[in-house]
């Protein structure tokens, strides 16, 4: 097979010269000589003649070329000529690859080159070829190298110069020995200069001892001169040599594989052309070829190993010389320039047969100097601009010492250099691998290589994926967490990481902009800004002395003033022992890996991070050591459940100091001593308005502590007192006190009021601060805690309450002995559910339990998903850019069409929207009770003409009068809409209604609800109905003696004009936000301020002399009890209840029954009614004027008839006790005749709208309910007032967008509380038909199959009793 391949190559030699000369020249220029020739041979071999013998005879001169060798001996070879045969024989023994087909192919190429060059021989058989003079004038240019990198990369196995003299000499001498003079040679090589080429010499030889050749060249180059431009050029050339050596080794393997493929293809083609008689011989040749292929692969592997071993030996010898020698580098005598010049002249004049001894000595000295200088060059930075020399891989030094920064950085740089070194190698491999496609216009520009990594060769589908992958090589992490400072390679990883901070720091947005590492000092993480010192924020300060009070903590957010300004920061004027100025939950968890403390002399570098597990264990140990004796100034989490401490030990500790708690409670250091006292006792912290002295000793109910142990765990809420007392310090205080000396912080134990205008002394409120006039605590509280719209924040779970009581208590007895075939089968209806959780939720349809309760509005739900959907209505509403104000009552609306409907309520005209819908669209102001004494905004001052708040009308105003009596309302957000739209009318909220009703069974003084204190604060402002049937919004809690000057029980229904009412009323403060009956139990957040001289002047009508109410007694013993009796007036069971929509009637009836049980003094209620009727008499004149302007004749007649019937019904239904009380009040105490009764609009079921008198008859309520029901179907809800046009699918109230109009209509029912689908059995209402169908399933079990269920229950109970016996 070898002879066959040689004959084929020889036969094609003459054809190449004539037909392919131009192709060979181009291939040599582009460095693809061998590949181009092999490709041409591959094409030509398919049409080769079978007669090989005749071709050998015709081209007989070619056959000697296959065995003869031409040795190109440089003129300045350090070895003498007589030693060359020995060296060649040694090389022939060590490298068997020279007899391979690759070697034969190479010889043919050399013979072709010789015949094409046609040199002129001299007597010594040498051919002298001189380079152009232009190259000689530019020795430092990159083009002055003897061969370009591309040409060298495309040469055979060793396209490099043989001796160092070739780099410096411009005259190249080629020794061409005739075939008969050199019978055998193991290292064939030749240097040719093509006539049509660029004049660059091309070396074609096999790689042999390349490492030693490069070492000799380096030694010669460095020995010529250590400085100057020549040395720099030599360094560049040396870099090229080492870079090319690596590329050629890779290229050699690839070319050998191509030759093997060519041989196999030639064998296959030859086998097809042979006759059938020669098939056996062909098969033997094929087997021999396969054997030769395997042998070739083994030889290739041996050659690689041998080359690597030689390289390692050379490196080891160089290191050994450097270690053992220790001699400074030998400098030549004279300047470097003179030495270089003299050496060049000596090289030109010297003969090739110089003495061996001198050459050997020179070789040894220069090699040792070159190795020493190479070692020195590795450890010193290269000159600027020597980019080629800097790319040399110098990963050959000893192993680095442990923890050595210099060696670590050097090793990293070498890795990067090695990675960049592979770029050229991969590029050349691509050229060869896809060389066939280059002719078709494709090659490396095709999409497959467009996003290919040059480090590892992976291919990606997009440029962005490639850039992200490259970061794995470079170690770049551009995305930085702005909270803890951690870095990430992708934005997605940062987003996932940032969710860990979202719950602790919800107001900080994620910074998705890439930040380079050198810009870290301009972008410090948030935790570093929050740290009081440069050390880690995990460590607590030193513990204070045992008897000293806790010192005030320094501000923890020094650089965060502009990012987030907490509402409590502006309340530091009193300078008392203030708690931490930020909310406890605002401190995020420190997720950073703390860097170890470095010495000052040690360079500040980025060390490898410590293992997270070890660091966390050390941190836990430190915290365990520090937690017992030290207080925690910066707690990281919030706890509700508190440990109980023995009473004696607690009282003893409270007398001396505040004991820091072992549990990481965030507010343990910030609470007042009063809170510590009752919290140590195990009582739940309760927020409550200020109580008079007589009621500060409540009796604890047995179930008052039953819910704190079952609070939700997802987001732990702070304790109630700490949750509100720190945020609303002037409005709330504790109700659970142990002794009379721990009464309200703002009032003395004797009950005496502080002088008006004098702030309470600091010892009365140890942790209370002054309040800014523009501070809205509800808005700031809810805005800081509720999640923002379209966010993934889970802080809404702070406002849910989960009842962990057993949901299947009613079914446990039946399930004990029931034999159920399926584990997920319902024991009641035998329905099989998909899983255990679905079965548990299914049981709630039988038991009616709703364990998930909203703490803001009190609604309960069967599943957590429904509660989460409900929490969306409490989220913050986008800010209103403008609003439309009513000229009469100064209410504000975002939609002008809704304002138009609202004005029709004033004029008595029929409206397209119900008052509920109009009320829902109103823009609320913060409640006046949450504001300080004399501050009212302009709208609030005008709106206080309304008089809708029936709080006490009399008494001189004081700075602390109204500021301490407010209850918590809804935040200025979507919660306004939710609370103003029938929080109580909840058809699917049985559990919530029953719980509220049962909570009212407690005594009036006992206001400490167990787990529902937050909810009870809201719902104690629920609708109260007085004896006249008017919805009363007075809180049931009695107020203190300073604020209990008198009460108007039914003042919301009396006035018909805000102007006259404002002029006729005395200056007063509201005790709670008004609950309009249109909202049916929700807080009316519209401010009702007392008119001042400026605000009351807005009224176009003349003022009237205000009626001064009688002053009530001020003693703490009598007034408190009297005020409690006044506020708990009796409620007739049938009067006024039907005036409300039917959804709230059941709840109000139960509430009325509890109020009747709590009634203690009927005379006080009669006195309040007497005062109410006096106000009605004062407003009678303006009512007559309004009736003449607004009423029409037809409405007068219709309403007059209804008024007559209503008066008769009221006379019959009024309780005799209340009637006697009216008579006892005197002749002037009775209500005067109301001529405006006939001018009422057809919505009389909303009596607390301040414009109309109360509806006091059952017939009147029924008539108006019928009118409302007849109007509602004809006028569907259309907030945009677009007749016949389907408007946008965006909600006009909360600005949510829905996919269709029907979904929007269903959504509007959540605002309007409209439930059009009624159950025919229990009369419950539902918003959708699907909910009604689901509800009907419960009746199918409970009612329609009641007999079956009863029999089954009896059977189960009998079986259970038998088993029990």
Swiss-Prot record:
Residues 530-539, 1055-1079 have a biased composition (Polar residues). Residues 63-76, 87-99, 146-157, 1040-1054, 1085-1100, 1114-1123, 1146-1168, 1192-1218 have a biased composition (Low complexity). A zinc finger (C2H2-type) spans 451-473, 479-501, 824-846, 852-874, 884-906, 1289-1311, 1317-1339. Keywords: Developmental protein, DNA-binding, Metal-binding, Nucleus, Phosphoprotein, Repeat, Transcription, Transcription regulation, Zinc, Zinc-finger. Belongs to the sal C2H2-type zinc-finger protein family. PANTHER family: HOMEOTIC PROTEIN SPALT-MAJOR, SAL-LIKE PROTEIN. This is Homeotic protein spalt-major. It comes from Drosophila melanogaster (Fruit fly). The lineage of its organism: Eukaryota, Metazoa, Ecdysozoa, Arthropoda, Hexapoda.
